[in-house]
Amino acid sequence: ADSEALLRGLLEAGRDVLYLGFSSGLSGTYEAISLLCNQLAAEFPERKIFSVDTLAASGGEGLLVWHAVQKAREGLSIEELRDWVEQHRLNLAHWFTVDDLMFLWRGGRVSKTSAWAGTLLNIKPVLHVDDEGHLIPMEKVRGRKKSLNALVDHMEKSAIPPVADQTVFITHGDCLGDAEYVADKVRERFGVRDVVINYVDPVIGAHSGPGTMALFYMAESRN
């Protein structure tokens, strides 16, 4: 109801709409809003209404929106913006780690046995969002510092050059010190000047727990 009221208000005010949705691989929200957009398009035929499944989450979706805003300021039309997002969404790399495996167990991401064993052995998973928009475990490292460094290592392997010119987003689950550590590593290793740090959003944070750390940047590919 809130989404419909927002979209309807924009359309009634004579605005066109480009909806960039949270990954359909992690939520049913995109499908619901896309259906709503189609219904409203029939009701407001004089307006342009587009929806794009970003296949992204958290700061990854935010960074994709940030890039879209820059393109809009450069003068791209709404159709060109839609096409740009569709063409570049799989260049948006998401690399995550978590500090408490029990949150992943409660969310069904790992088994209870794996969560307990990993906790005892101080194992930290490194995860990413794949081309279908799913959150996938990629590797395991021992110790928090190694998991933070692993995020930056992945950026070194895949970031689109010139890396120093990129805008990088970092989100964290109430662990600002770790976020600043990763930001410093990104600045030191790649010369990046524009690093934006923010809290992980509540929905993601509820599933991943305190200590969640995520790094987002533009990459040759997500893998």
Task: Label the predicted regions.
Residues 26-29, 33-39, 44-50, 56-223:
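Mixed-charge interfacial surface used for oligomerization/domain docking
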Residues 1-42:
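Class I S-adenosyl-L-methionine
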Residues 21, 50-51:
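A glycine-rich beta-strand to alpha-helix segment
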